[in-house]
Regions:
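Helix-breaking motifs and short loop linkers at transmembrane-helix boundaries and internal kinks
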Residues: 36, 68, 89-95, 106, ...
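Conserved MFS/SLC helix-loop-helix module at the cytosolic interface between two early adjacent transmembrane helices
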Residues: 55-93
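Paired small-residue
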Residues: 79, 83-86, 94-102, 293-301
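Cytoplasmic helix-loop-helix junction between adjacent transmembrane helices
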Residues: 93, 99-140
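C-terminal membrane-cytosol helix-exit motif in multi-pass small-molecule transporters
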Residues: 166-185
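Juxtamembrane intracellular "pre-TM" segments in multi-pass secondary transporters
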Residues: 181-208
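C-terminal transmembrane helical hairpin of 12-TM major facilitator-type secondary transporters
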Residues: 269-313
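A late C-terminal transmembrane helix in Major Facilitator Superfamily
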Residues: 314, 318-352, 357-360
Length: 374
């Protein structure tokens, strides 16, 4: 008999990686000033974060199949908490970068193991609906992160942010010790070479990988570049934090719209097409309006597109790999997080939010059209 985890706990664990990333974004300006580095160097910590996150997804995904879901989750949370503690105490920028990489490696467990546990416990239409609920949770996580990050940065700078992250990780670790069940029924023999070859030859996997990566780059490039855009427009880090409320509302509306349309029987293909159109409109709007605070209005369309697209892509991506859910999730996660890291690295160099948004939107449209031709 399957032991199903609490949906509430799963929502929190899937939200946590996004919360801890966006809570850090308002502190980028403070980090640049405190360590006397450029904004471009400070922004690159986000690219490093996602690259290390990709490695973590692979390691924790493989360990989830080998050790089990529960112990893997606990070890990952422990690694994250200790890394946040190191980042809080150092006075060297290179150590901050290393601690950020290790923290990303650790918290990747919240993404890959949570998704694996959901795929263990649910299937078919039920799994799609559960991921819809997850999407609603994910939609509010940037709001929480940005608001907390803005206030904490104003209160005590980046060190207060990292201390808060440590406390949050410790609290989740203790809660999971008592409440997280094991969902793996039996361990499956793993032929990693065979699995990797199969996935790399699967066009559906590549399409899903590109869509997840591009929608995330569109979203997180705002958290990467937005703090500097706000400063250039004369706004503070706390005011940048408040902007997360606006964008979180957009993602929340997108997630609710996704849930409503799924309930009305709309197909995944039609929902992805709607998301693609919203992203195109939002991307061009951001490009045209980015010299004023009104660029937040088209950014709403971008985050709405994210809220619609991501639950649909994630729920369907690994339907043919259920017997090796952890390892397949690890490979899938590695693929899209490496692309996210590379994309945000380019975004940090370009330092133009509008150009990044248009590039993501056009590419998403092409991938969506190729997916519809199947």
């Amino acid at each position: 008999m399957k032991t199903k985890p609490s949906i509430g706990l799963m929502v929190v664990m899937l939200m946590f990686p996004q919360i801890v990333e966006t809570i850090y974004s308002p502190a980028l300006g403070d980090i640049a000033q405190s360590f006397s580095v450029t904004y471009t160097q400070a922004a690159q910590t986000l690219s490093i974060y996602f690259t290390a996150f990709a490695i973590g997804v692979v390691v924790w995904g493989l360990l989830a199949d080998k050790w089990g879901r529960r112990p893997t989750m606990l070890v990952g949370l422990l690694v994250y908490g200790l890394s946040a503690l190191v980042a809080m105490q150092t006075d060297r920028f290179d150590v901050v970068m290393l601690a950020r990489a290790l923290s990303a490696f650790g918290i990747a467990v919240g993404s890959v193991v949570t998704q694996t546990m959901l795929r263990d416990s649910f299937s078919g239409e039920e799994l799609g609906k559960v991921f819809g609920v997850m999407g609603i949770g994910i939609s509010v996580s940037p709001v929480i992160g940005m608001l907390l990050g803005g206030q904490l940065t104003a209160l005590g700078g980046y060190q207060t942010v990292f201390f808060t992250l440590f406390v949050m990780a410790l609290g989740l670790f203790v809660y999971n010790v008592f409440k997280l069940p094991e969902t793996q029924i039996q361990k499956q023999p793993l032929n990693m070479g065979s699995l990797l070859g199969r996935m790399l030859r699967d066009a559906q996997i590549w399409q899903s990988t590109l869509l997840v990566a591009l929608y995330n780059i569109a979203l997180f490039s705002y958290y990467q570049l937005g703090a500097f855009t706000f400063e250039a427009l004369g706004f503070s880090s706390s005011e940048f934090g408040y902007s997360g409320v606006v964008l979180g509302l957009g993602t929340f509306v997108g997630s609710l719209l996704n849930k409503f349309l799924l309930g009305k029987g709309r197909t995944q293909t039609s929902l992805l097409w709607i998301a693609s159109i919203l992203l195109l409109a939002g991307g061009f709007g951001v490009f045209w309006a980015q010299t004023s605070i009104w660029f937040l209005v088209p950014m709403l369309l971008v985050v709405m597109a994210f809220g619609i697209a991501i639950p649909n892509v994630l729920s369907a991506a690994l339907v043919d790999y259920k017997q090796q859910a952890g390892s397949a999730g690890a490979v899938f996660g590695l693929m899209y997080y490496l692309l996210i890291g590379a994309g945000l690295g380019l975004a940090g160099i370009i330092q133009n939010l509008g150009v990044v948004q248009i590039s993501c939107a056009v590419t998403v449209s092409l991938v969506t059209m190729s997916r519809m031709k199947k």
